[in-house]
Amino acid sequence: GLNVAANWDKINVSGPVYVGGMTKIEDGATIVGPTMIGPSCHICEGAVIDNSIIFDYSRIGAGVQLLEKLVFGRYCVGKDGDHFDLQEAALDWLITDARRQDLVEPSPQQKAMAELLGTELTQAAS
């Protein structure tokens, strides 16, 4: 897409991948096709997106790994149809709307979960 903000030398991309315009991809991200990332998304450092579809204005947090997922708004759907509401599951600090202007500070429980998963936390900001 047009006006994609990415340092392609510091991002791992393989297979057919579409990236929509105005999307920001941070260094260290990995994108494996077939994958489609809609316009105005923000893919944070170390995120892995594999065989997935990410709809417009999605923010994928640092270290998040998505395999065969469909992300739209506050919902995430797996290949088998399992789905969950990111806000209700208190995971909107990992995957959220890229247009959010507020900062979301992870709770102590979220920090502990991230430590167990080996995921580095960043504040959710657009």
Protein language model annotation of sequence segments:
Residues 1-126:
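Left-handed beta-helix
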